[in-house]
Each structure stands twice: as C-alpha cells, then as structure tokens.
Amino acid sequence: MAALKGAQDIGFAEKDPTDDVEALDPRRKLVLSANLAFGVSLREDDIPCFGISTISAEDITFFREHGWICKLFTRAKKVSSGVSAFVIPTLFGITAPEIYSNVAFYGERIGKFGFSGAGTSAGVYPTGSSVLADCLDIQAGCDPFYHVIAPHPCLINNSNEMKRFYFRTQGKQFITEPICVGEAFDQIRQIQKAEPRA
C-alpha cells in the first residue's frame, strides 16, 4: 500500500487506483488503438486482461534479484483469424525507465515507429490538454477523429502469441517455458480458484 500511495503522490496513479492496478485503463487505450488501426469493433470485455494487484513484495524482491522490473504491457496485432490482443504485467530489464510510457506501431509500408513520454500524467497536464482539445473541436464542429464502427464479429485469437510467464503458487516462484497467452490466462484462473490469495 505504501508503494501505491507513493505512486499517487507523484501522479503515477489515479486517486482511485483501480483502473491502474487492474489494468483497465491500459485496456481501454488498447481497444481504441486496435479499433482505429484495424477497423474493427473490439469491446473491453473481449480482451484478456490481468493487472498488478496480486503482485506481492515477495514478487518484487524476486524480480529485482533477477535484474527485472514489472510494467503493464498491452499488445494488439492483426492476425488471419481476427486480432490478437491482451494486457499483462511484463518483466523488463532493470534499466527500463520506470515512469515512462512507450507506444510502438508497425505498418507494412511505414515500418516500426513509436512514441515515449513520462507516465506521470494521472489527472495532470497531458490529460487536461487532451480534454481541452476535444472541447475546442466540439465547439468548432470538427469531424471526430474516432468514428464508431458498426459492430461486427471480430475474434480475439492469442493462440500464436508465445511468451514465458512468471507464476507464484504455494509459496514457490517459477518461470514457464514459452506458452500461448490464452493458456497462461487459463492457468492464472486455475491458480486463483485454488489459491484465492495467489
């Protein structure tokens, strides 16, 4: 709780941190980005999402001992059978800047490009600037940048996304061999059912 209070004090977490620690805010941003990029109509509930609320001091110690820090990571990718999309805590090298957010895009013709900026914007200037810009656009009668697309089925398929996962169960920590994201979420549900505090 002390870490969360510290994050709120510096603007890294909202006053009500639920959207931050349960990864709901990153998932909303992922939905908007994926819908714009792929011309689909994903809903928040379609996307598997796992936050950081169950990460313990023991986990953080384990990460540091291995030279890692944990950050929320979102990914959306067009696949032949729909869209691969998920939100998960991810381990990065300890040198990764803790309070920076990064967004990377890849297009067939444009290649890879990205943006990086301070992540301490919970209710501060970047948010206020965006809200003000939206209000001015509405007042000026500008055509909205984001158009709601007529709903049509779009399958979330994470079966080809192979990652290694960190699990803590029965007081033991382990890293899996590469498994698909869907399988990892199934394992998470099973662990939480057997060990509600895991």
PLM segments and residue spans:
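Substrate-binding/catalytic subdomain of NAD(P)-dependent oxidoreductase enzymes
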Residues: 2-102
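Short hinge/gating elements
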Residues: 13-16, 113-119
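Conserved phosphate/anionic-ligand binding catalytic regions in large, soluble enzymes, centered on
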Residues: 23-26, 121-130
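Short acidic-glycine loop/turn motifs at beta-strand connectors
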Residues: 77-80, 107-111
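Active-site lining segments that contact anionic ligands and/or coordinate catalytic metals
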Residues: 82, 100-102, 112, 162-166
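Low-complexity, glycine/alanine/valine/leucine- and proline-rich hydrophobic stretches
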Residues: 89-110, 118-126, 173-182
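Helix-enriched interaction subdomains in cytosolic or periplasmic regions
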Residues: 114, 118, 125-126, 134-140
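A conserved regulatory-domain signal marking ACT and ACT-like small-molecule sensing domains
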Residues: 130, 135-198
